[in-house]
Amino acid sequence: VSETVNRLNGGRRTSRAAVAIGAGLVLQLLTIAAVLLATGAIEEHLRGVYAQYRPDQAERAGGIVVTYLLVVGVLGAAGWLLTAWAHRRRTRWTRVLAWTFLVLGTLLAVTNLAITEYGSRLVPLWLGVAGLVPSLAGLAAVTLLHRER
């Protein structure tokens, strides 16, 4: 992968941390795409959650949850872009920034898995797990950033 990135980068050597950051951005964008493609499934899931208790709230909840997931996804992508920019400029605070986004992103992803209402998850399990995947790239990125010192 690094050799391909080097060729695309005009022959300049690309660090492994930069590759991990780029992979994290791609994974984040795929997570956003999953939310967009699964809007109907998310709304159907929430109809099941609210069916016995508040069927009138199911449609509204679907829109709220989808909007929330999209906003979180876009903010995550912005975090990846900011981290890539800081790394490319070789700023002193790149590692702190990467750690901050890793912790915040992972906490949000775990929260998405844990949020329940009426005993059921608000975010479908498969989508909650998919939201954790960019954190794996983030863990790789912060590890590689510390090795670059």
Residue ranges and their predicted role:
Residues 2-149:
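Topology signature of small-to-medium multi-pass alpha-helical membrane proteins
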